[in-house]
C-alpha cells in the first residue's frame, strides 16, 4: 500500500519539524528543523538528560562567569540535540539563533558563527547545517553575510511576499513560509472560521511565493512550515520541501488516498526585478497587518521559550 507520505516523498523533500529523536527515527525524514520551543519540549524528555548534563559541563569549562555559562550552555544544548538528530537524518539540521537577536545583524552573524563552530568541532561539516534566523530586515542582512561565508541559512517566521522577495534577493539558501499561523490570524480577525485547503490563506501565500521564485529563477528553496491540518500539506504537494510535525506525519502515513501534485511551475523564467530597498521592504511588509503581527508574535514566543530554557539550565549551573 502506497501511503500519502510515500507519495509526498516522490514530489517534495519531507522534513520533520521536531526535536523528538524517537519521532524522527519513526518517520525517516530527509532533514529536521528545531526552534527554541521544540528544544524546550525535547529537553523535558528523559533521554535528553545526558545532553543537558554535557552542555552544562561544557559551559562550566568555558567560563567562570554565570551569565556567559548560561549562553554557552544553551548554545551547546541546541547543538547537542542537533548532533543526535544528525545521527538519524541523512540531510540537514536547522538550528535557530536566539530570537532576541532578531533585530541585530552583527549579533546574529556572531551567534551563527558560534553555532557552526560548535558543530564543526563535533565533526559536522557546514553542508549538513542550516542556521535559522527570523525574517526581519536585519536577519535577512545577516543571512546575506553568512551565505557568502559558506554558512547556509533557513529564514523563518516568514509571512509576507516582501520578506520572501528580500530573502531571495539576498541569496538565502532556504525560507520557511508559515502556513498555519497565517490561517490562525485570518480565523481570529474575520468572520470566516472554516477554510477549504485550496482557499486557506496560508496555502495561498506559500503557493504565490513558490510561483514567484520559479517565475524569476531564484534558487532559494521554499519549505512550507507551520501546518494545522493535513489538507494544507496535500494542497502544497510539489513544494520544494515541507517541514511537518510528527502528528501530521502520522496522519499522512495512515492515509492511502491518492496524492496529486499541486505546485509545479511550467512558465518561462523572467528577468529578475531590482532588489527591494530597505524602505520598500518596510513599506510593503508593513502594509500587511497579518505579517506584521505574526512576525512580532513569533519572535516574542520564541524569546519566551528561550527564557524558559535558560531558567531550566540556570538551575543546573
Curated annotation (Swiss-Prot):
GO terms for molecular function: transaldolase activity. It is found in: Cytoplasm. GO terms for biological process: carbohydrate metabolic process; pentose-phosphate shunt. It holds the Pfam family TAL_FSA. GO terms for cellular component: cytosol. It comes from the Bacteria. InterPro entries: Aldolase_TIM, TAL/FSA, Transaldolase_1, Transaldolase_AS. Keywords: Cytoplasm, Pentose shunt, Schiff base, Transferase. The active site is at 132 (schiff-base intermediate with substrate). Its EC number is 2.2.1.2. Homodimer. Transaldolase is important for the balance of metabolites in the pentose-phosphate pathway. Belongs to the transaldolase family. Type 1 subfamily. This is Transaldolase. It comes from Haemophilus influenzae (strain PittEE).
Amino acid at each position: 500500500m502506497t501511503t500519502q507520505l510515500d507519495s509526498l516523498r516522490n514530489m517534495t523533500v519531507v522534513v520533520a519539524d521536531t526535536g523528538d529523536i524517537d519521532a524522527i527515527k519513526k518517520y525517516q525524514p530527509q532533514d529536521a528543523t528545531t526552534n527554541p520551543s521544540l528544544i524546550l519540549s525535547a529537553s523535558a524528555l528523559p533521554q535528553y538528560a545526558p545532553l543537558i548534563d554535557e552542555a552544562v559541563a561544557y559551559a562550566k569549562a568555558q567560563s567562570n562567569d554565570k551569565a556567559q555559562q548560561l549562553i554557552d550552555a544553551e548554545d551547546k544544548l541546541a547543538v547537542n540535540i542537533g548532533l543526535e538528530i544528525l545521527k538519524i537524518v541523512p540531510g540537514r539540521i536547522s538550528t535557530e539563533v536566539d530570537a532576541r537577536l532578531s533585530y541585530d545583524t552583527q549579533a546574529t552573524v556572531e551567534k551563527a558563527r558560534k553555532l557552526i563552530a560548535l558543530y564543526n568541532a563535533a565533526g559536522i561539516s557546514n553542508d549538513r547545517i542550516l542556521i535559522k534566523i527570523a525574517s526581519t530586515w536585519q536577519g535577512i542582512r545577516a543571512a546575506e553575510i553568512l551565505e557568502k561565508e559558506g554558512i547556509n541559512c533557513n529564514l523563518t517566521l516568514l509571512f509576507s511576499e516582501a520578506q520572501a522577495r528580500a530573502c531571495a534577493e539576498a541569496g538565502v539558501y532556504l525560507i520557511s513560509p508559515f502556513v498555519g499561523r497565517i490561517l490562525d490570524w485570518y480565523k481570529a480577525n474575520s468572520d470566516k472560521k472554516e477554510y477549504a485547503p485550496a482557499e486557506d490563506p496560508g496555502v495561498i501565500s506559500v503557493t504565490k511565493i513558490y510561483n514567484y521564485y520559479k517565475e524569476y529563477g531564484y534558487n532559494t528553496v521554499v519549505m512550507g512550515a507551520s501546518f494545522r491540518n493535513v489538507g494544507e500539506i496535500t494542497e502544497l504537494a510539489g513544494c520544494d520541501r515541507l517541514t511537518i510535525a510528527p502528528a501530521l506525519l502520522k496522519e499522512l502515513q495512515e492515509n492511502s488516498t491518492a496524492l496529486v501534485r499541486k505546485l509545479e511551475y511550467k512558465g518561462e523564467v523572467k528577468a529578475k526585478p531590482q532588489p527591494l530597498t530597505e524602505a520598500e521592504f518596510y513599506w510593503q511588509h508593513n502594509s500587511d497587518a497579518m505579517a506584521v503581527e505574526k512576525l512580532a508574535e513569533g519572535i516574542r514566543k520564541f524569546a519566551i521559550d528561550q527564557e524558559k530554557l535558560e531558567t531550566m539550565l540556570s538551575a543546573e549551573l
